[in-house]
């Protein structure tokens, strides 16, 4: 079966009354990732990047451009990556997840870039990939890292609409 991914994204709605739902979805994913890592020192960091420009009255206007969510959870190992790359994945269904929340990211933001440092087969690895409505998941790369690198995942929501 062929699929028009942009059409699939367009089927989802982001109510105007809940504009922070994509951020909430990303934070829930981070919380679950920390739970899956079974660590007691879980950490989530949220960074808001703003565009700064002067308006006509010499006052700074700052619109949100990007939001970055960083956590030290389990990361995008093969199992989690394959779940992310599968629309309506049942991987986390026991946690009440439907496998479609990331579509909200693309309703509110132009694209998403992900960098995840995780452990697989007793080796530290870094997986990077892009996610957007035109190409779905693309440009995925994995490389091995030295063991002293900290395990972190950075989800960057780019270009607030």
Segments the model singles out, each with a brief description of its role:
Residues 92-161:
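GHKL-type ATPase core
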Residues 56, 61-67, 153:
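Short beta-strand element(s) in the Bergerat
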Residues 47-58, 137-147:
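Short amphipathic beta-strand and strand-loop transition segments with alternating hydrophobic
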Residues 1-54, 60-62, 79-85:
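Bergerat-fold GHKL ATPase/HATPase_c domain
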Residues 75-77:
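A short glycine-centered beta->alpha linker in the GHKL/HATPase_c
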Residues 71:
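Acidic ATP/Mg2+-coordinating residue in the GHKL
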Residues 45-47, 66-68, 113, 154-156:
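Beta-strand secondary-structure signal
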